[in-house]
Amino acid sequence: NQGKEAITIRHLMTHTSGLNPGIPLTIEIDGVSKDWAGYEMAITLAKAEEVRHPPGTGFIYSDINFILLGEIIQQVTGKHLEDFTRESVFLPLGMKDTGYIPSQNLRYRTAPTKWWDGKMQRGTPNNPICRRTGGVHGHAGMFTTAADLARYCRMILNQGELDGVRFLQPETVRLMTSVQSPSAVDSLRGLGWDINS
């Protein structure tokens, strides 16, 4: 476990798990450093990471936290993360232009992310781990529009309700938008939200 047995969902959501910022982009095979690819390899590498400090005692912004949260959602629900988010979050909120891997008819509306592989990327995740694993991860890869994001924000501002439909309990919104990080940690975080930067 390398000190990971005490990590909780709350630690992952507040970046207080103690895990490193990210997984390595290369692995050593027979003494040679090589690139890797594939979702399963990303999960294997994330699970293999050691903690830098005991969970709950410090803050490290870590993609690994949300990579693992995405995997937990898939394990618990039995659904691919892309399907779960579409069916359980985006469609119920009327966010019709939000998701992973934008379709060709939405790509022209997607803001370019960066120059990579000899061209400006549009509709391709900016994060190298997400790109290597098919574009769907808990920590990166999602695309949306201003209109869809506004719907999500309205739901949060209305304590979990949008257009008369209850999507989240007010207590859930409070946990997201108020300090949930341990008192020993300088960075103030809600569950999945940054509070003070």
Language-model segment annotations:
Residues 2-197:
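Short, surface-exposed loop or secondary-structure junction motifs
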